[in-house]
């Protein structure tokens, strides 16, 4: 996928609500997410890999991984508002992508996370 097309698709996602500074929430713009995930793809090749998006926010990085061919993405998010946006963004994907996504509501470091050997 071309960087411009990936950036445009990611820019259409509902943005992260960024309401809780105690969770160190930051929004990632579509252009940055696209170039970052394309760099990861060039280094490790996302196609066929299992990815975990910790502190997923609106899901922009994990969704990019799905668009670049990741086999499955587990999105981990603790914030209720961000999880709502994340679920909305995943539901807006076509079925071929959304069925390869799992959302876990968990606080990293506080909740017990069982992840099935992610690659990335």
Feature map (PLM): residue ranges:
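S-adenosyl-L-methionine
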Residues: 1-50, 85-116
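Active-site catalytic pocket residues across diverse enzymes, especially alpha/beta-hydrolases
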Residues: 40, 69, 90, 94
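Conserved SAM-binding loop of SAM-dependent methyltransferases across substrates and taxa
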Residues: 58-70
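Conserved SAM-binding motif I beta-strand of class I
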Residues: 72-77
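Conserved Rossmann-like nucleotide-cofactor binding loop
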Residues: 81
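Short SAM/SAH-binding signature in class I
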Residues: 118-120
């Amino acid at each position: 996928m071309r960087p411009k097309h990936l950036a445009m698709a990611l820019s259409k996602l509902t943005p992260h609500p960024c309401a809780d500074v105690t969770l160190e929430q930051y929004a990632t713009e579509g252009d940055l997410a696209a170039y970052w995930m394309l760099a990861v793809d060039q280094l490790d090749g996302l196609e066929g890999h299992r990815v975990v998006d910790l502190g997923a926010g609106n899901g922009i990085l994990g969704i990019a991984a799905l668009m670049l061919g990741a086999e499955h993405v587990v999105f981990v998010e603790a914030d209720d508002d961000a999880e709502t946006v994340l679920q909305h963004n995943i539901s807006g994907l076509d079925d071929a992508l959304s069925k390869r996504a799992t959302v876990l509501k968990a606080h990293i470091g506080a909740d017990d996370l069982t992840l099935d050997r992610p690659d990335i």
